[in-house]
């Protein structure tokens, strides 16, 4: 890494009064989680779906639950257990400790539904999950039932050869019909967003206090660029963004610094430079 880039990173850290952590699927790669780079990448983990040529957008939508709930819950049940068993990598703790050194602390904006930030000890009141959480459930037909969202305590058993749930399907605690993950899916008009709108309000309140945020973005893809757009919005042309991405680290001129590397390696580099100025 050249000295000019390192000097920029030190200057960003030294002037920051709050840490805005933004994270996409690439944040979990160093913990061993897949980032599903296209259908081919997903089919490596779910060969049963590959045999049927069922892509991510075809399984990750409410229609999949309506047409074949066992298969849809086979996919999401497997992911649920995988996330429960995953240990967050060191980078999570390093980011948390860095944020705690700044005047206004940290806030997390993530498109990940895996709950890894909570698992790593981050304050749940300082996390905005913009696409929801797999660790919560809602009714498939909330307009006819209830907008309630509740903890996902199911213990799924999956037949991986067919990507099918073989344990009982989760039921809505109000009407007894099928329950689904509290996640924003494709072509999804019934996702109950209100718990996450509350998270968003807390984030907006925090941003009003912070005058010079340091934005560290990790593993945010370009296919669904929600996280990337948000990072650039917060940076707001102030060169406050550090974008970490092994494949798509490109950053707009005047927006900040790009690090073409994996999440953990990039975080460790930033924290090393932080020790020199904090």
Question: What do these predicted ranges mean?
Answer:
Residues 1-278:
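Conserved catalytic alpha/beta core of Sir2/sirtuin-type deacylases, generalized to analogous enzyme cores
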């Amino acid at each position: 890494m050249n000295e000019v880039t390192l000097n920029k990173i030190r200057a960003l850290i030294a002037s920051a009064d709050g840490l805005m952590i933004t994270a996409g699927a690439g944040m979990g790669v160093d913990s061993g989680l897949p980032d599903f780079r296209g259908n081919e990448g997903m089919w490596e983990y779910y060969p049963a779906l590959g045999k049927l040529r069922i892509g991510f957008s075809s399984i990750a939508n409410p229609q999949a639950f309506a047409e074949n709930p066992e298969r849809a819950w086979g996919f999401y049940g497997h992911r649920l257990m995988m996330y429960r068993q995953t240990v967050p990598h060191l980078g999570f703790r390093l980011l948390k400790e860095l944020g705690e050194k700044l005047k206004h602390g940290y806030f997390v904006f993530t498109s990940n539904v895996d709950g890894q930030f909570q698992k790593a000890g981050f304050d749940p009141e300082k996390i905005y999950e913009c696409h929801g959480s797999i660790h919560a459930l809602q009714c498939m037909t909330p307009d006819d039932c209830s907008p309630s969202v509740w903890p996902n305590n199911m213990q799924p058993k999956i037949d991986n050869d067919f990507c099918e749930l073989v344990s009982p399907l989760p039921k809505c605690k109000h009407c007894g019909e099928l329950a689904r993950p509290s996640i924003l899916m494709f072509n999804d008009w019934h996702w109950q967003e209100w718990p996450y709108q509350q998270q968003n309000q807390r984030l907006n309140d925090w941003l009003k206090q912070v005058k010079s945020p340091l934005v560290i973005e990790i593993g945010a893809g370009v296919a669904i660029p929600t996280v990337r757009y948000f990072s650039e919005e917060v940076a707001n042309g102030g060169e406050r963004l550090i974008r970490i991405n092994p494949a798509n680290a490109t950053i707009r001129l005047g927006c900040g610094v790009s690090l073409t590397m994996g999440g953990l390696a990039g975080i460790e580099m930033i924290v090393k430079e932080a020790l020199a100025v904090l």
